[in-house]
Regions:
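Intrinsically disordered, low-complexity terminal regions
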Residues: 1-164, 168-314
């Protein structure tokens, strides 16, 4: 049951120990969520105040605080310093004396399922351990940090950053600057129209599918780096970029006649200029393969086929 702080001059707090719905009376401009297990959905509202729907609580109560325009949804014992802070909490706390409770439950044995509806211009920060994250329609900037849970990002604009340890990220129709960092998680970008992508992963695969925005076309600005992950990039038609793609031991595949493939044994490169070379594409992997693909023309019949990694081709 929710408990509201009686002091209106101080931050307003609630504790959710069961399923509950709440509509916030004060405007929300920044959202901070940090959770362990379960699901978190953040959806942009077309109009009206911010809302929270808690459909499941298993473990300690969910702690909600509204301090001015900042709304925080979390637990009282969780740190707020991104995925590394959550990872350290998860790795160290279970082995400390306080980890057990009178009920026999361990500190990390908790789960919630929540949906937050906020104005599209809200700045959104989500940090989670083992929770599935879904964010849709946000234009105020989105920052997602996960330890092992996967994240799905749909229709976002503004700056988007995703940092994972082992979770994968799928970004659909993202139009802002996009940054991704992971140890072993993969990245899939579908119909990305922003053209600005910075991504690095140690072993995760990267599939980048870009679609030009006819209303405001921008040159691509792509920098990808991986150690052992495979990289596949599909560029919009017509493509316009200076290209340099390298792999030390992997295979290469190139669909553009204007690009040159060099290297027979060992290191291989794809280099050259597409169109006027206004954009930049740089991709590097040590042992993974690289594929540069051509997206069908915008007036071609039907949507472009989904981009997948074909290890037989790569």
């Amino acid at each position: 049951m929710a408990e509201q702080s009686p002091e209106s001059s101080s931050p307003t707090t609630w504790h959710f120990a069961e399923a509950q719905k709440l509509t916030f009376g004060e405007p929300v401009t920044e959202l901070r969520v940090r959770l362990v297990s379960g699901t978190v959905n953040v959806v942009a509202a077309e109009e009206g105040p911010a809302r929270l729907e808690v459909t499941e609580v298993d473990g300690p109560p969910l702690y909600v605080v509204q301090d001015g325009g900042t709304l925080t949804v979390s637990y009282e014992d969780l740190p707020w310093n991104g995925s590394q802070g959550l990872k350290q909490w998860f790795e160290t706390k279970p082995w400390k004396a306080w980890a057990g409770s009178a009920s026999g439950r361990k500190a990390w044995e908790r789960s919630v399922a929540i949906t937050l509806t906020v104005p599209a211009a809200t700045q959104v920060h989500v940090a989670a351990v083992g929770a599935a994250v879904f964010v849709s329609g946000i234009s105020g900037g989105t920052d997602v940090n996960t330890v092992s849970g996967d994240a799905t990002l749909v229709g976002l604009s503004g700056r988007v950053k995703a940092h994972t340890v082992s979770g994968s990220v799928e970004a659909q129709s993202v139009s802002g600057e996009f940054g991704f960092h992971s140890v072993s998680g993969g990245l899939t970008v579908v119909d990305g129209s922003g053209g600005n992508v910075r991504a690095d992963s140690v072993s995760g695969d990267m599939l980048i599918d870009l679609a030009a925005d006819p209303a405001a076309p921008e040159p691509v600005d792509i920098f990808l780096n991986s150690v052992s992950g495979q990289v596949a990039i599909r560029l919009p038609h017509p493509a316009d970029a200076k290209v340099e793609a390298n792999t030390a031991t992997g295979r290469v595949s190139n669909a553009f006649e204007d690009l040159r493939v060099s290297g027979q044994m060992g290191a291989k490169r794809i280099t050259g200029t597409l169109g006027s070379g206004a954009g930049t594409l740089r991709a590097t992997t040590v042992s993974g393969s690289i594929a540069l693909l051509r997206r069908p023309q915008a007036d071609a019949e039907g949507p472009a086929a989904p981009l997948t990694l074909d290890k037989k081709v790569l």
